[in-house]
């Protein structure tokens, strides 16, 4: 059974790094960025089993189209594909996609219009005790519990959560086998939201988005931890562009208006031009209404090459890329042994932007500009006032005439 989709209408100032500048200069004009895009969300279901479905986000610009294909077949995964035509489409052949050899089961057509493509796969959810933890991102020293393989989760029908008004949908899942009952009242959710123009969400971390991006919020809610002060982590796999792994960068600023006390922005950049990217603040939250009081550090390990067959396989990644010779992975760890944690309210959320082209760059906020103006302007005004006072004083002395 096959489905074929026709075109539808529908934190602070950071200087540009040499890498970003080269991306800006070298990317084709059609993919340098669109101020607005016509965005559509469509659920593509297997007619033989409606519980098997894909979420296709199609963002059409003047001379380009961005395709985000989200899937819960196997581990949660997303394909990022950018084309240089506003008429590219997604083709899905369910019979091939679900077979042992899924080559050609998922394609973006015409294939020659593809300018960039890669994928992210969320493979495992880690849990470990935070006791005596020194470097959670690379080697947790506390007790490590058996990880949850996200390929062995059961997920909701994405159609039930599709919201065209907010251009969002949510994959919500729990382990198929849960002998400890940890997820009896809990779930792991992946909320996806697309954008037709630039802006900033109302809730922290308030990542600046553009029409070339979509946002993913990962939330662990209500699951019973296996330790008194458990920390959780997420394993993320991606495809390298060539023999190496994508690059990881840190941007720093003096502005924390949108995410208080967080002065860093982390980025993952793929190497091809135009590049795809991930962008996130190194912060997670232990309450649904994120605030400074519920902020937890988010640590990321370095990207390292890995063999694809050692990771849970995503059918859509296998179908689109055929061979996966250059896989890389890294871990994200949320929280620390002290401070806010998942144990507060059995809640954890983390947000990331995915996109193609040049990552959004924050300008200094009006508040910071005002503070800088006052800080720099006050001394100048004092000097000016002092100079005027001296001049007026000298003038008065020169006008004085002795009565003698």
Swiss-Prot record:
PANTHER family: GLYCOSYLATED LYSOSOMAL MEMBRANE PROTEIN (PTHR31981:SF1). The chain crosses the membrane at residues 371-391. Interacts (via lumenal domain) with lysosomal protein MFSD1; the interaction starts while both proteins are still in the endoplasmic reticulum and is required for stabilization of MFSD1 in lysosomes but has no direct effect on its targeting to lysosomes or transporter activity. Glycans are attached at residues 63, 132, 157, 185, 228. This is Glycosylated lysosomal membrane protein. One of its GO terms (biological process) is positive regulation of transcription by RNA polymerase II. It is a single-pass type I membrane protein. Highly N-glycosylated. N-glycosylation is essential for GLMP stability and for MFSD1 lysosomal localization. Residues 27-370 are lumenal. Required to protect lysosomal transporter MFSD1 from lysosomal proteolysis and for MFSD1 lysosomal localization. One of its GO terms (cellular component) is nucleus. A motif (Lysosomal targeting motif) lies at residues 400-404. It holds the Pfam family NCU-G1. Keywords: Glycoprotein, Lysosome, Membrane, Signal, Transmembrane, Transmembrane helix. InterPro entries: NCU-G1 (IPR029382). Residues 392-404 are cytoplasmic.
């Amino acid at each position: 059974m096959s489905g074929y989709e026709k075109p539808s209408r529908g934190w602070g100032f950071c200087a540009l790094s040499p890498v970003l500048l080269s991306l800006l200069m070298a990317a084709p004009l059609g993919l340098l960025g669109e101020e607005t895009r016509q965005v559509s969300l469509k659920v593509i279901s297997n007619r033989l089993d409606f519980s098997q479905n894909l979420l296709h986000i199609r963002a059409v610009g003047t001379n380009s189209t961005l395709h985000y294909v989200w899937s819960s077949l196997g581990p949660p995964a997303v394909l990022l594909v950018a084309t240089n035509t506003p008429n590219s489409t997604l083709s899905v052949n369910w019979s091939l996609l679900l077979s042992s050899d899924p080559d050609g089961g998922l394609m973006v057509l015409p294939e020659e219009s593809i300018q960039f493509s890669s994928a992210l796969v969320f493979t495992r959810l880690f849990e470990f005790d935070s006791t005596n933890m020194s470097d959670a991102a690379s080697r947790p020293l506390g007790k490590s519990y058996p990880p949850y393989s996200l390929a062995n989760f059961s997920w909701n029908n994405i159609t039930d959560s599709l919201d065209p008004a907010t251009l969002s949908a949510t994959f919500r899942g729990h382990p198929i086998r849960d002998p400890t009952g940890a997820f009896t009242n809990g779930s792991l959710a992946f909320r996806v939201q697309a954008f037709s123009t630039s802006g900033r969400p109302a809730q922290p971390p308030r990542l600046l988005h553009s029409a070339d991006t979509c946002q993913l919020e990962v939330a662990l809610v209500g699951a019973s931890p296996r330790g008194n002060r458990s920390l959780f982590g997420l394993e993320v796999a991606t495809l390298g562009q060539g023999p190496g792994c994508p690059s990881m960068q840190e941007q720093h600023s003096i502005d924390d208006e949108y995410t208080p006390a967080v002065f860093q922005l982390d980025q993952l950049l793929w190497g091809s031009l135009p590049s795809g990217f991930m962008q996130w603040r190194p912060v997670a939250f232990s309450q649904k209404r994120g605030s400074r009081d519920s902020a937890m550090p988010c640590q990321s390990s370095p990207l390292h090459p890995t063999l694809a067959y050692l990771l849970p396989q995503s059918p859509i990644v296998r179908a689109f890329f055929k061979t996966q010779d250059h896989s890389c992975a890294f871990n994200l760890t949320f929280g620390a042994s002290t401070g806010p944690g998942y144990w507060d309210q059995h809640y954890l959320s983390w947000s990331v932007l995915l996109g193609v082209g040049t990552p959004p760059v924050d300008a200094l906020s009006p508040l910071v500009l005002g503070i800088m103006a006052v800080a720099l302007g006050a001394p100048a005004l004092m000097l000016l006032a002092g100079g005027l006072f001296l001049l007026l004083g000298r003038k008065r002395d020169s006008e004085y005439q002795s009565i003698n």
